[in-house]
Curated annotation (Swiss-Prot):
Chief place of localization: cytoplasm
EC number: 5.2.1.8
Statement: the UniProt record of this protein carries the keyword DNA-binding: no
Name of this chain's protein: Peptidyl-prolyl cis-trans isomerase
Function: PPIases accelerate the folding of proteins. It catalyzes the cis-trans isomerization of proline imidic peptide bonds in oligopeptides. Has an important role in sexual development and serves as the target for rapamycin action.
Keywords of this entry: Cytoplasm, Isomerase, Nucleus, Rotamase
């Protein structure tokens, strides 16, 4: 249970986000059946947020800090670290495992 990270391409191996850092990333989220439910790539605009302060699903708050600047990874997030029994009406069914392809583009003002 939780979040599992599979590295697609390595980052710099030195800079990792800490709670409270502002991160910039691209992501594509899919269900285990392959259905895409969200993508910053498709919108053409990276996602900017604060990591580790409870603004995001737990799987991101715990998975993204394991990535170094510039890294591309696949995060597999179990329902208890995602949207749980509520799901996200219209997009994510209850108790869904989520798959995210994530690229960490920046931590605060430091870019990959």
């Amino acid at each position: 249970m939780g979040v599992e990270k599979q590295v697609i391409s390595s980052g710099n191996g030195q800079d990792f986000p800490k709670p409270g850092d502002r991160i910039t990333m691209h992501y594509t989220g899919t269900l285990t059946n392959g259905k895409k439910f969200d993508s910053s790539v498709d919108r053409g605009s990276p996602f900017v947020c604060t990591i580790g302060v409870g603004q995001l699903i737990r799987g991101w708050d715990e998975g993204v800090p394991k990535m170094s600047l510039g890294e591309k990874a696949k995060l597999t997030i179990t329902p208890d670290y995602g949207y749980g029994p509520r799901g996200f009406p219209g997009l994510i069914p209850p108790n869904s495992t989520l798959l995210f392809d994530v690229e960490l583009l920046a931590i605060n003002d430091k870019k990959a």
